[in-house]
């Protein structure tokens, strides 16, 4: 199974979701976002957009992905968000998927549901076998 790389804010929603997956993970640190990973991974990222969709991708994630090696090893992205934000729901994952030419594998709301966790576990298992 591959590595999960994630970023989580003070709400801890993304961190909670990732912790339920039972897989190895690496947290992008707000203070040391230029860290490198050395194996293929799936990125799990929340969305922080204003009403116009600006600044959807958290700055530490941008810094992390500015490292060429980190971009090369990303195999997919999973997005967290809040459906109350309508068209901006999980916007960060869509932006990253498009800019980095990787698939957006799944989107979950807030902390995710038990069903989300099951779907992502099964989906990642299948994804890493490809």
Curated annotation (Swiss-Prot):
Molecular function as annotated in GO: FMN binding
Q: Which Pfam families match?
A: Flavodoxin_NdrI
Which Gene3D superfamilies does UniProt cross-reference here? 3.40.50.360
Q: Which domain of life is it from?
A: Bacteria
Task: Mention one GO biological process in which this protein takes part, according to its record.
Answer: protein modification process
- InterPro entries, from UniProt? Flavoprotein-like_sf, RNR_Ib_NrdI_bac, RNR_NrdI
> Tell me, what does this protein do in biology?
Probably involved in ribonucleotide reductase function.
Similarity comment: family membership: Belongs to the NrdI family.
Alphabetized PANTHER family for the sequence: PROTEIN NRDI
Q: What is this protein called?
A: Protein NrdI
**Native organism:** Bartonella bacilliformis (strain ATCC 35685 / KC583 / Herrer 020/F12,63)
């Amino acid at each position: 199974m591959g590595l999960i790389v994630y970023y989580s804010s003070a709400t801890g929603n993304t961190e909670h979701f990732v912790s339920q997956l039972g897989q190895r993970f690496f947290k992008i640190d707000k203070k040391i976002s230029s860290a490198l990973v050395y194996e293929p991974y799936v990125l799990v990222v929340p969305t922080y957009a204003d009403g116009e969709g600006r600044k959807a991708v958290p700055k530490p994630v941008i810094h992390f992905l500015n490292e060429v090696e980190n971009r090369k090893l990303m195999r997919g992205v999973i997005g967290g968000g809040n459906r109350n934000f309508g068209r901006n729901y999980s916007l960060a994952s869509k932006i990253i998927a498009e800019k980095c030419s990787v698939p957006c594998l799944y989107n979950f709301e807030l902390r995710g549901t038990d069903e989300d966790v099951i779907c992502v576990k099964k989906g990642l298992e299948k994804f890493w076998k490809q």
